[in-house]
Amino acid sequence: MVEQNPAAVIEWVDIVDEQNNVIAQSSRQQMRAQRLRHRATYIVVHDGMGKILVQRRTESKDFHPGKLDATAGGVVQSGENYLESARREAEEELGIAGVPFAEHGQFYFEEECCRVWGALFSCVSHGPFALQPEEIDEVCWMVPEEITARCDEFTPDSLKALSLWLTRNNEQDYGKITPREA
């Protein structure tokens, strides 16, 4: 849910417990500031022939600005289910609408700045893409080998989502894409 008033737009998100049960609502800003556990969607957009659509996040993003993203998606709004969120995010970010989404289950991801229950989806799309300028600077196609070679440039949560998708789709060679240890 997004609440609008003349001073600001407040995006409300559901806060969840360790088992992914909703326990509260919070503003997105408070969720980020306090590192509250929340929900997000991850959508692997692919061409059906081995290439993954990769996005470069804008520098104004509140989470990993300027990094590459192996998935589309975003934070689930309060009261929204995962599929609704995935469809909304794909349309807002990339202009993808009216295509089937495959569901690939849920996963938990945690790092220093984020605790999230993610739902993994995929869809086939060949564009053209209508990029949301506030969110995405550019997109390009990459094969899993390219993503693996450049994994330090990617958001860690999107790498986990992509790794799960590749594993669940029997791409065993690329099933464990993780950022390199510094």
Curated annotation (Swiss-Prot):
GO molecular function, one term: hydrolase activity, acting on acid anhydrides, in phosphorus-containing anhydrides
EC number(s) per entry: 3.6.-.-
Binding positions for Mg(2+) per the UniProt entry: E89, E93
One GO location term (cellular component): cytoplasm
UniProt key word Hydrolase: yes
Cofactor requirement: Mg(2+)
Ribosomal protein in keyword set: no
Nudix hydrolase domain residues: 36-164
Keywords: Hydrolase, Magnesium, Metal-binding
Motif (Nudix box): 73-95
Pfam families linked: NUDIX
Classification via NCBIfam families: PRK15393.1
Family affiliation: Belongs to the Nudix hydrolase family.
The protein, known as: Uncharacterized Nudix hydrolase YPO2781/y1614/YP_2383
